[in-house]
């Protein structure tokens, strides 16, 4: 199993939630103090360096017009990390290509970072959450189709090495593609795609890309991974799906005693409890298929999922639903082990190890305790060459 330290680079110094309508899209940027923001970036970058020092890989992502993730140009930060680090794999998850007008530019950015890092890039792509539509001045209709067409164009740009080539799609048209530099890795960096739906996972599996899912827990993750495996096999990849093709993101905090661990986990939970979003930004018309809208409505009505992505969620409830792992090293190892077997195995653990008011020392404690006391056991227990899906049924049936 590979582990990746992940922070959304949040800006938590906000007034009480009652004083604003939404933390995303419309929150006035007069609330952002650039001096405090600069200090935050200094510490976030240092925490990624510490993760590398402890043998943990690095992950970052991109969002727009929100205090929950002040990283609107993730490739810039990734380029800085390419020069500030030396051995960690660098995952961006990811590029919101359905909202980018020029996929070839994304191909160039990723190729350049791959060269700067001497082949350590893991290039991830995301459809983008609904709250990204307005900031991108984008159209939510046919977003998924744009996403996949853009990714096809990017891969073509990376792998066409004999002079200009052209691309004629439904949404993108390019007559002279000939990027310099080309990627350091051949034929191109590993490709990741994130999705939280079974339908999306089947497409990722059919392409053979690495599938990541975020905070889908005990309830949602098995169907997503099953769909990935089905798509993989139907595309003729192989009968067996390696666990290293699957990734899971969760909030993770580890400390040497229960009191410290719980205190850190409570602060980490800010990521979901502070995420106040106006209803009209959460599901713009055309973003989701009708069937998905029905399921979301049923889920909210039944108390499933996060509803308004957090609300009154507690750390104990988050552990119970599989969106958080926290505690002493022994407890966290057992929590991850239980989840691993329930979902049929995964080879990449994306650790949201910093959020909200979790300070630098607390974040570093969590990184180091995980890296030294939990990660070696995970690597021994769950080898990268394991096969996903074996034993999943019996494990799931015990819950």
Question: Which residue ranges define each predicted feature?
Answer:
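Hydrophobic faces of well-ordered beta-strands that scaffold small-molecule active sites
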Residues: 3-7, 58-60, 90-93, 121-125, ...
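Active-site mouth loops of central-metabolism enzymes
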Residues: 28-42, 94-104, 185-195, 252-255, ...
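Glycine-rich, proline-tolerant flexible connector loops at the mouths of alpha/beta enzymes
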Residues: 59-77, 97, 215-216, 351-362
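An alpha-helical appendage that flanks or caps ligand/catalytic pockets
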Residues: 5-32, 141-180, 220-343, 379-399
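Conserved, mostly hydrophobic/aromatic
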Residues: 3, 62, 81, 113, ...
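N-terminal beta1-alpha1-beta2 module of alpha/beta enzyme domains
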Residues: 1-88, 189, 388-392
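Acidic (Asp/Glu)-rich catalytic clusters
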Residues: 49-53, 78-87, 110, 114-121, ...
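A conserved active-site cap/scaffold subdomain adjacent to cofactor or substrate pockets
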Residues: 197-220, 224
